[in-house]
Every structure is written in structure tokens, then in C-alpha cells.
Amino acid sequence: LLVSGVNPFLAFAVGIILGFSLGIVNGILVAKVKLQPFIATLGTMSIYRGVAYIITGGWPVLDIPENFRKALDGDIFGVIPSSVVLLFVVGIIIWIILKYTRFGNYIYALGSNEEATKLSGVNVDFNKMMAYAICGVGAALAGMVLLARLGTGEPTAGQGYELNAIAAAAVGGTSLMGGKGTML
């Protein structure tokens, strides 16, 4: 969209909506179809990469507008990278959601004991789908920051990052059994 002359803000919004929608697809596969989360997300990742190859013909997308690049990969006051500010803002929003909202409590409850959460009257499937949708938005944001940083839309960008993310979460102390953890 950016290369075809679409307004960068509209392209950004479409990217976020697409990330949300593809996250919902993952959520449906896990919550409704009852696929194992690792299998569902690994499978859809392969499908989404295949679609990226088809759309781009396997070639990088060049000529990313400079204003888009500066917005997501520029510096604020010439010192602080805007991507760091974006990460900080998103981190605060997620922290507030997890700590101070009913949805955040439901996410912890789902990770701790899904059956007890369901018996407590929580709509487990909906909350799972929303969690995956939020992850999809996060992936879309990360993809746009990477696009701005590289200055090109590489259909192979990010390959191998998924294992780095799992390792970073585990090394950072996140319980792989769920139900525990904080933003810090």
C-alpha cells in the first residue's frame, strides 16, 4: 500500500487491522477448533509467509516512503529512537491492561487454570481470541517497525525470530506453564 501511494496513516491502519484479523484467525483455531496453540500458530505462520511470497513474487518491496520510515525509525529530539518510544508506550498500555482491567485478570486466570476460569463464568473462547488478536496487533506493529528500519519489505524478514522470542521469554523468567508473570 505504501509503495502504491496510499496515505501512510491509512496503510498503517490497514496493517493494524490485518494483524488484528489474522490474530483472530489464530484465536479461532485455538479456541473453537481446539488446535494446540503451538501447532495453530506455526501453521498459520507458514500460510501467512506463503501469502507474502505470492504478493511480492518473492522479491523485496522497495521505495518505502521516507515519511513512514522517519515516523517509525527516526529519532525524537535527535536522541531517542521512535521505535523505543513506541515499545515503551505499548508496554505501558499492556501493563495497564494486565494489571487494572477485568480482561487482564481473565488472561492470567486462563493461563493458570482454564477449566476453573470457564466454571467461574468467564467466556474463555472470546478472551482467548482477543488475546491472540492483541498479539496479532503487536506482530503488525513489530513488522512495520522492521519495515521502517530496513527500508524495504522483505518477504523473508523475521524468519527465525520466533525461536528467539520464545527463548527471550523463557530466559526472562516467563512461566511456560502460564498464569504468572508481569511486564517487568
Predicted regions and their residues:
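Transmembrane helix-bundle core of multi-pass membrane transporters
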Residues: 8, 33, 37-103, 127-130, ...
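Transmembrane helix-loop junction
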Residues: 3, 27, 31-32, 99, ...
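Short coil/turn motifs that cap or connect alpha-helices
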Residues: 25, 113, 123-124
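Small-residue faces within membrane-embedded alpha-helices
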Residues: 15, 19, 23, 27, ...
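Structural signature of hydrophobic alpha-helical transmembrane segments
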Residues: 7-18, 84, 157-165
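Membrane-embedded helix boundary and interhelical linker motif in transport proteins
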Residues: 1-28, 77, 179
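Inter-helical junctions in multi-pass inner-membrane proteins, predominant
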Residues: 52-55, 97-104, 131-171, 176-177, ...
